[in-house]
Amino acid sequence: VHRRFEILGTPDGITVADDFAHHPTELTATLNAAMKMGFNKVWAIFQPHTFSRTAMLLDDFAEALKIPDQAIISAILPVRETNTYNIYSTDLGAKVPGSVCLDTFEEITDYVCKNAKEGDLILTMGGGNVYMCANMIYKQLKYMEENK
């Protein structure tokens, strides 16, 4: 099924995958499964989808994002909303100890590619265009592997 734990590849021993999970229940189920798969470290890169959903489910998202070894939170994808909720990805990050908030996919790609190790799982999650970040990470890791 497209965008359900879809594995892009394993460049340099680092597995890159993408999942459509965009609700706390889906995040929890997917992350609990990932944590049982034997990876050295599970990285969850989450793109919150809409300001209203993020505001309404903030605490539930935070609980889900405490499951992986490392949570990275991108900027909230507004879709057709304006931020009348005055909520930001850093509000979610503040509730997830050790999380990192990075606005752009470029920043996330740089951070992950500098810090991920062989045996890790990089899992992008969200209902928006975060799959593009998975593609960027995969391509950068592949490039690094080929140019050692």
Residue ranges and their predicted role:
Residues 1-148:
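ATP-dependent carboxylate-amine ligase
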